[in-house]
Amino acid sequence: MYTTGLIGKNINYSESPEIHNNYYKKNNIPFFYKIFNLKQDQIDDFIKNLHKNNIKGFNVTIPYKETILQYLNDIVYPADKIGAVNTVAVQEDKLIGYNTDYIGFIKSLQYYNIQVKNFKCLIIGSGGSAKCIYYALKELNARDICIVSRNPEKARLKFEKKVKILNIKDENKLDRYDLIVNCTPIGGPNLKEQKPIELKEIKKNCVVYDLNYTPKRSKLLKEAKENGAFIINGEKMLIFQAYSAIGLWCLNGIKGGR
């Protein structure tokens, strides 16, 4: 039996174990998935003991999607371009990093039949998830992509020079956007009572996507729904990226895993 899992901080809320273990059982895959709640100073030991603990692969979530890069021997496109990794395959002599969030986000839009070509898009946040969503929207030919961040100067170091980056306090013309994506943990399980931004005036039929999936409908999504938006949480993205990760961990891939 091989071990797989999720590393992050304060992540006991994650639905990943249920998704993965159900899939393993259904497809007779000899894997088990568990949570690894790690502090920053525990990552070194976790990496050193991967083979000892029979770990075949692992996912990475907040706040370590960029931190993990220093431990990898190879980073596969588009993770290398994004500069963030959420899936690691453990081979005999090396660790390989991937970004299956990228795939999961694109597949979730396809699931809801949302075509973002020519959309004006707003990304809330500037961390690893935000970079992933930015490159996915570029791949899908979104017309215009703007980033809002609490620290725009720091954010500018992470994105292409041509990207428009604003202080989140200064962006109040939300009716210009066709798609708004929250890539922060604000509104998620550890910050349920907060919203990353006020949605007082948004375009009718605007798509508001919150990558958080717990609670199912965050305060941001509730407000968006009240204002006529089509709302999406991160559950489908989580599922699609999980299947992609499983495919990478299995030697020859598995049915439905890619």
UniProtKB/Swiss-Prot annotation:
First-tier enzyme category under EC: oxidoreductase
Classification via Gene3D superfamilies: Leucine Dehydrogenase, chain A, domain 1, NAD(P)-binding Rossmann-like Domain
Keywords: Amino-acid biosynthesis, Aromatic amino acid biosynthesis, NADP, Oxidoreductase
UniProt keyword Nucleotide-binding, yes or no: no
EC number: 1.1.1.25
Binding-site residues, shikimate: 14-16, 61, 86, 101, 213
GO terms for biological process, alphabetical: amino acid biosynthetic process; aromatic amino acid family biosynthetic process; chorismate biosynthetic process; shikimate metabolic process
InterPro entries documented for this protein: Aminoacid_DH-like_N_sf (IPR046346), NAD(P)-bd_dom_sf (IPR036291), Shikimate_DH (IPR011342), Shikimate_DH-bd_N (IPR013708), Shikimate_DH_fam (IPR022893), Shikm_DH/Glu-tRNA_Rdtase (IPR006151)
Reaction(s) catalysed (UniProt annotation): shikimate + NADP(+) = 3-dehydroshikimate + NADPH + H(+)
Residues annotated as catalytic: 65 (proton acceptor)
Amino acids binding NADP(+): 125-129, 211, 234
This protein's record includes keyword Amino-acid biosynthesis: yes
A GO cellular-component term linked to this record: cytosol
Pathway: Metabolic intermediate biosynthesis; chorismate biosynthesis; chorismate from D-erythrose 4-phosphate and phosphoenolpyruvate: step 4/7
GO molecular function, one term: NADP binding
Function field: Involved in the biosynthesis of the chorismate, which leads to the biosynthesis of aromatic amino acids. Catalyzes the reversible NADPH linked reduction of 3-dehydroshikimate (DHSA) to yield shikimate (SA).
PANTHER family for this protein: BIFUNCTIONAL 3-DEHYDROQUINATE DEHYDRATASE_SHIKIMATE DEHYDROGENASE, CHLOROPLASTIC, SHIKIMATE DEHYDROGENASE
Assembly description: Homodimer.
Family: Belongs to the shikimate dehydrogenase family.
NCBIfam families: aroE (TIGR00507)
Protein name in the entry: Shikimate dehydrogenase (NADP(+))
Species annotation: Clostridium botulinum (strain Hall / ATCC 3502 / NCTC 13319 / Type A)
Gene that this polypeptide is encoded by: aroE
